[in-house]
């Protein structure tokens, strides 16, 4: 094998030596391509696996933790919630519409392949600078519009509501955008399907769309940095067909009602290669596959292309022997391709045939369960010492600061985005995009509700990767708790830069430690997740962005707690300690272009007490609303609530310094109280600091010296974002 071919497959010299040992010979091109895909960062997690070990993954309500297509938790009454978050960062930067659309398609397959009907989508999106007339801003407006259109197109065509998410902007994402997709489905807790292939002689069946050349090398592309040489990689981006996926989902759900199969796996990154090796690897089995039987969309396709294509809307099934025709009939009824392409063996080896000739033979273990794990060098970044001392002037009046922060893209209402998503299809949505807080759906059969919230502050993770990651877990959980639901588990999408940079690996290591700590302390285990590395361009990495989605359950869907005002004259209370924390704050960034300071550790006792107080007060029906205090502090939190509800506020709060209305002290919330005496007694019992700061009502936004027309505040908050994004329209 010539060196140029090996290098083109991103195989290091050490890895090639290991391949020679495994095979006992030189690999052919097909085998090299398979090793390249399965040992890519995207498939093998070779740089991250060391630090993922030790994540809390167990609890009485956890049915399936990491290692399968998606995580599964018990949500009561014999119902299970199946959910996961995935990234499609690199493809979306190259071709935003198809990249984002197929990201949605992939996460949907991960969920419904477990036997669940998907009932909710969410997303977590990061873009660079979108304001102004620079070519960079124009590019990111294009990326934003394309990605959002792709997400909406796929979800809407599938008939699945997109009910929430988060979108933020920072120059650190100028060279790499982050597109993270989340899906949640429901099924019976005793009817879950797994990605395994076992039982010698059991047939292996290919179902779904035909295989083409789209997406070739996608897994390897997603495991590399961007530079001037590889920015035009459109052929590596898959092309999605949501209508084909809708048929595939319905066919799979029909199949799951029968006892015909052993296991089923989505063909995601690395296509037929990853699905076959993962299914056999989990079971310790071997497999024979006859690649000339694979349904092909293009003529002249080779075994190499068939194994590595990432054509969408495809699944691999291990059926029970004797039931293969029943399986084929179901998929053909739905007008999908379905062919028997192989069988399970006991050899522990993958044997690939092309017109009855052996084209490739590889042991399965070293490419699946026993894939290499790297111990990359780590080094604490030098920049941390440079940014540790945050000094910001106190020379800007609060009115000026208020409007400056209100106009920041990450603050502004994102109706331009979520209006492209159908949030109400399936008629289960209780709380949808634009309402603040956790998104919520009802489980009609049980009367319960599932709340879910996405959260991550990249600036906080840049300033302190461990505390920042812990805060993401806590903040996502708090949003769920503020809806009245009990947070139960998380899924994560860990977006970091180039792992070959020791400082990036240190950020990743610290981020994992923060997640472990927070999940243990808050009793929200990790049940699924994804790692996306190489989010860097020309040596510049994105801010560490460990996106978290927390899922929780409210025993009574009728007690879902709102996040905004719904009446006038309601007492408003601020819960938690305000200590003047401006580290990594929007105030420091927007007004002084400074990102730095020292984050305070998460006070888990205070965080848990806040959750428990609001959940209990909601059960006693003494709250009208509850909302987490987040970016921009109390002032921006109240401005959002007033704008959405079209109800003013009149608040006066005694802080040490006037600008503390913008501070981002952690573990705080704003609540509307119906019975003040009862609530204050309850808050005292739980040990949560409280202060009555005002009332809702009127058409003014009043907070200390800020006294503005609510109409003016609403005009900015509700309409400014669309004006920014639509500049070229």
Curated annotation (Swiss-Prot):
Gene Ontology biological process: 'de novo' IMP biosynthetic process
Residues annotated as binding Mg(2+) 2: 110, 266
Any single GO CC term annotated in Swiss-Prot or TrEMBL for this entry: cytoplasm
Entries under Pfam families matching the protein: AIRS, AIRS_C, FGAR-AT_linker
Catalytic activity: N(2)-formyl-N(1)-(5-phospho-beta-D-ribosyl)glycinamide + L-glutamine + ATP + H2O = 2-formamido-N(1)-(5-O-phospho-beta-D-ribosyl)acetamidine + L-glutamate + ADP + phosphate + H(+)
Residues at which Mg(2+) 1 binds: 86, 530
Function summary: Part of the phosphoribosylformylglycinamidine synthase complex involved in the purines biosynthetic pathway. Catalyzes the ATP-dependent conversion of formylglycinamide ribonucleotide (FGAR) and glutamine to yield formylglycinamidine ribonucleotide (FGAM) and glutamate. The FGAM synthase complex is composed of three subunits. PurQ produces an ammonia molecule by converting glutamine to glutamate. PurL transfers the ammonia molecule to FGAR to form FGAM in an ATP-dependent manner.
Classification via PANTHER family: PHOSPHORIBOSYLFORMYLGLYCINAMIDINE SYNTHASE SUBUNIT PURL
Name under which the protein is recorded: Phosphoribosylformylglycinamidine synthase subunit PurL
UniProt organism field: Campylobacter concisus (strain 13826)
Higher taxonomy: Bacteria, Pseudomonadati, Campylobacterota, Epsilonproteobacteria, Campylobacterales
Gene this protein is translated from: purL
